[in-house]
Amino acid sequence: MDVPVTNMLTAAEEALNQTFLSDGYLVVPVENQAGLDRIRDCVAELAASHLKIDLPNDRQAFLDGLHQHVDVPGLNDMRLAVINGMNQQPWLRATYFSLVRSVLDQVVGNELVMQRRINLSIQLPEDSSSLLPVHADTWSGDSPFEVVVWLPLVDCFNSKSMY
């Protein structure tokens, strides 16, 4: 007896999957705003500590204006200090995953592996040396079957973005 195949996805889920397949990326809101705030605050605290400045109350404004506190020659040292500090936080990886868990589950399934260390990229205004090419880990030998979650910690717009 033939059993009819039915689509188990809602129309919204199907549309999200089709967008991912056609565009190769998705822009979605985070699922855990408190987790995003905690990660952002952690990054701000680590950056201020490395720069030896008092952490302002408005951590979002601090990160949005970080270029006022660090120059291009000092950028990589600060970035590495923040990365090391982030990866020492036992809660951070699980919190990062919680930001997009259901979208990842829908798009790629639940049999996932997460890289061991969280990374960080920072671009300063008018700094062409820190701009990234189109991101494709397959060129460096990573699997073409991976999904990269990029989480902006600042307000991104036309000239204030990754590309």
Segments and roles (model prediction):
Residues 130-163:
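Catalytic core of non-heme Fe(II) oxygenases with the double-stranded beta-helix
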Residues 41-45, 64, 125-129, 159-161:
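Short alpha-helical interface elements
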Residues 93-136:
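Hydrophobic alpha-helical segments and helix pairs
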Residues 32-35, 120-127, 139, 155-156:
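Short, solvent-exposed loop/turn segments at secondary-structure junctions
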Residues 27-30, 112-117, 148-152, 161-163:
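A structural signal for short, well-ordered beta-strand segments and their strand-loop junctions
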